[in-house]
UniProtKB/Swiss-Prot annotation:
Induction: Expression is strongly induced under conditions of nitrogen starvation. Expression is positively regulated by the cluster-specific transcription factor rua1 that recognizes and binds to the specific 5'-T/G-G/T-C-G-C-A-T-A/T-C/T-C/T-G/A-3' upstream activating sequence found in all promoters of the UA biosynthesis genes. InterPro entries: Acyl-CoA_hotdog, HotDog_dom_sf, Sec_Metab_Biosynth-Assoc, TesB_ACOT8-like_N. This is Ustilagic acid biosynthesis cluster protein orf2. Pathway: Secondary metabolite biosynthesis. Part of the gene cluster that mediates the biosynthesis of the glycolipid biosurfactant ustilagic acid (UA). UA is a secreted cellobiose glycolipid that is toxic for many microorganisms and confers biocontrol activity to U.maydis. UA consists of 15,16-dihydroxypalmitic or 2,15,16-trihydroxypalmitic acid, which is O-glycosidically linked to cellobiose at its terminal hydroxyl group. In addition, the cellobiose moiety is acetylated and acylated with a short-chain hydroxy fatty acid. It comes from Mycosarcoma maydis. It holds the Pfam family 4HBT_3. Residues 1-20 have a biased composition (Polar residues). Residues 1-22 are annotated as: Disordered. Coiled coil: none annotated. It comes from the Eukaryota. Gene3D superfamilies: Acyl-CoA thioesterase, double hotdog domain.
Amino acid sequence: MLQEAKVSTHTSNPLSQSVPQYGHSFDEATRVERLDSAPESLASVASTKLKDTTVWYRLAIQSEWCSTPQVPHGGFLASLLLSALLEHQQSQQHPDPYTLSYDFLKVLSPGEAFISVTSLGKVSGSFTSIAAELYQSRKEKVLLGVSVRGSFVNLSKQQGKSVLPLHYGAVSKLEEVPVPHPRSWYLPPSQAMISRQLDLLVKLETQRRPFSDYFVRFHPDDVDTPQQEDYSEEHASADLQSSPHYCKGSRILPLRSSHSRRIDAKSIPMFGDFRRPAYENVIKQDPCHPHDVPTRKFAFPTLQYTIRFLAKVPHDTEWLHTQWRETVVDGRIISDVYITTEQGAEPVAICQLDSLMFDMQWALSTMPSAEKSKKSPEASQL
């Protein structure tokens, strides 16, 4: 998930010697620039917001952080929004994220985009409520791609039992996370696809899948895939204690790679959905194009994504231990993700993804190809 671009030292730039040998692409890709005013292309949107409490940021959605060449990775977009929120809150009384609830509304494209951050005021003396929206201008139209609403706190001042509003209540393990009924407000455009899947999956009632355990980190030199180690009972040993080079109950992990970016709060949204990226949808306009062949039988575009931060991510954290539980409910897949540190000693966050499940092969077969659509109205069959 991390590209480490070597910076050339053979340059006429006098500042080149101060540049580190490795540049972390995640930090570059999630960088936001604060604007003095709303961009002209979003004037119609800016007129509906309070100028005194709204701040605008400019950013670039990079193609390297896409599930497909033109579909941004949902976890990356979530981290982009959190980057703007952290930038906005860094000098405020409450600098740490506590709860974030994302709604994925429209599929955006690589290119320039803008984020509006609006302070909703202090709901109490313990936390601040804040909202952000990710926009993109396309063909003189304004697209609202992702919106997020959440609360920020000062985790260093939290002592004893929390009085903040909790999404799940006190949770110390994945089994304690409830499975609520999905309540998504926005659906993909193809109603036929939705109806077909609802008819099929409603008959299954509720199906709970087994737990899945992963150890994940930023890959030292690959921007496209996370480096992960699957949980294995064969490598578990009750007698062997955890150490800097061994995670109890897992394979031996190279924990001390100097080239792997350390994990922080900004990267949690991306790690929370690495196994099911929001916007994971490789259906394109031309199903016969060689790059449009589906990579899996089913696609799971995420509609809602909620994160509750349980604690600050410890300094120098390289690996995270993630537990996944999936539940099929009425045409949706509810994914609960419990995230702890590499040794499982400290819980970091709980994530929940509400995703739509549909058969990609069926969907592709109902979409006309670009060439055949001119000759015949019949659907293309793969």
